[in-house]
Amino acid sequence: MRKQSKIIFYAGIVLGFAAVLTGVALSGGRKIPKDFTVSYEGIKTADITAGVSVHDPSVIEVDGTYYIFGSHMSGASSEDLRNWTSIGDGYTSSNPIFDDLLGTEHVFDYTGSRDSVIPTDDGTYHVWAPDVVYNRAQDLYYMYFCTSSTWNASNLCYAVSDKPEGPYTWKGALIYSGFTKDTIEATDVLDYVDIDYAKKNYIMAGNKYNYEKYPNAIDPTVFYDADGKMWMVYGSWSGGIFLLEIDEKTGLVIHPKEDEKNGVDPYFGKRLLGGGHKSIEGPYILYDEESGYYYLFVSYGSLTSCLLYTSPSPRDRG
């Protein structure tokens, strides 16, 4: 029996996963649906052998070599996407992916370790969900990742290397979440909004972080748009998925002007979707040059669930 399905792009390694993806093509100014139907007839499943284990994977290809990075300071490389060689793994100072991340000052000041302002809930290190992107302006590789302590207290960070495999040197923190009136001074939030705005919007009654409206600062991915601008999409559960522009010359986020009507916060950026602490996480935005559309992928619900949104602009949900 001949089986057909629609292809979906997944930001990582695709292992026998199929779903529905609807695209568009432009012809004479009209948008014509693109059919991604393919046949899997004759395709066999490869043997699975013991290899590397990478959670929350992000893959980048450089000169024919694929590099995969994941949570817990793990990474590997491959030339065929089947046979992988470990680069590093685990929370050790000698992990070659980083330039002694555990021994670098200020990395875990706010979250991510038992000694942080907000300690990890299990007393161990939490370094999660890295995404590596080549910065065209600087000819450097940037790794965006997060340290996290609880289900909403997290910190987006970045590190830099001149080689895709590393070592990556930590450069600084970008976005903080999960703060209260007692911990906001340990963040950079008040560099961008005043204390009255922060108390009104970010902190709920009972001195709790307003997690239903604002994000958990984890799961970052970075991409270039059609005009060459860099963007970072991030978020998990909590207030949903958010978008911030990246300054290509520095690798830092650009905090926008407040635009409440269009869901733009001066610190966290543009909320794309989600909120109310509903299931949604792991955002990834793919720009398709042929259609001129951006595809936003997120995971939600159970292990097998996935959502797809399309838009002609990276700042809007289609």
Annotate each language-model stretch with its function:
Residues 1-29:
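Gram-positive cell-envelope targeting signals
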Residues 55-73, 127-151, 170-171, 219-243, ...:
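Hydrophobic core segments of beta-strands in well-ordered, beta-rich domains
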Residues 67-68, 78, 86:
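Eukaryote-specific detector of the first structured module of a protein
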Residues 75-77, 158-160, 243-245:
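Conserved blade-register residue in beta-propeller folds
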